[in-house]
Amino acid sequence: MKRMLTFLLLVATAAPALAHPHVFVEMMTEVVFAADGKLRGIRHHWKFDDMYSAFVTANLAQDGKDPSPEQMLPIARTNVESLKEFDFFTAAKVNGAVVKFDEPTDYSMSYDGKDQTVTLHFVLPIEATAKPAKTFVFQIFDPSYFVAFAFQRTGPATLEKAPAGCSLSVSKPGSLSAADQKKLADSAGTMNSPGEDIGMKLADSVITACP
């Protein structure tokens, strides 16, 4: 991989070479509106696989107790700071125009002792737009598919404080072409990427529409 986040680099160093993807993230997102009805941004909740979770918490558990949010805050900070280089793995459009994101806020990390996984939480504010957001569409993906992002089956995305009449839907991607399927298969068991756009082609689209 030519591009790798700090926490992903640590995982790749600690783990043997596996087929793409190497890291799995289960997501839930909230499209957040401000009190005045303007679009504020996205609240991400990214639940990492057990391998990554075990690695980052290996030195945090004490006396048999689960890692605390306070212990994991530096890890959360490192992650969100590293994500900036990759546009937070989030591509968004407001009213059909590409938008950028401001610095993440409200970041934290939690630990689920039942399944021994960590979840990264953070708010990704949308840069201010002159016009009201009639449509807001975004995808979450790693273009190279080093990280596989997938929405949780139940309640994958919700609206928070949305104006009356707003709706939200999640659209599934189309099937990969035969050529892309071959690229994905050929990358199995290697550190090679199946292509710099495979992640996008496999990503769901979250669509918010407001009157």
Task: Please report, for each region that a protein language model flagged, where it lies by residue.
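Structured domain cores in non-transmembrane regions
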Residues: 51-130
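N-terminal targeting signals for Sec/Tat export/insertion, comprising classic cleavable signal peptides
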Residues: 28-55
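Sec-dependent signal peptide recognition
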Residues: 2-10
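Cleaved targeting-peptide boundary
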Residues: 18-25
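Mature, soluble, non-transmembrane domains
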Residues: 95-211
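A general structural signal for short secondary-structure junctions and capping/turn motifs
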Residues: 9-10, 82-83, 197-199
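N-terminal signal peptide c-region/cleavage motif recognized by signal peptidases
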Residues: 14-16
